[in-house]
Amino acid sequence: SAYREAMDALEELSKNFSGNKEEVKPFHVTLSDILRQYNSRMQQSNMMTKTTGELLLCFKEKNLGADTLSAIAEVLRKNDAVKFAKFIPLQTESKNTWEQMKNILSSLQQFYQTPKSQV
């Protein structure tokens, strides 16, 4: 399933991350890519080339809960800061971002599994 693949990718990413400075950027880029790939599969639409703003609009249109939407925005913006603004978070911050992504994927999976008549 898309969810299992995303969770496996997260686990693999965590196992291979030692916190070295040169690993930080690829780590955060991959976190965003995992979310994009998962959402692409669930939506059957390519989300890989969407900007963070476009991706957030897509999530907003889904009527996700405010907490989930806020968490997604926070994680994507932090990952963008690492990717584009040369922000180097502490290893603990990177691990926290990883945990947030894991929680986001769980929330999204519950959202996608809820019959639409209940939404």
Region annotations inferred by a language model:
Residues 11-119:
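Membrane-proximal, non-transmembrane interaction modules
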Residues 1-14:
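Cytoplasmic C-terminal tails of single-pass
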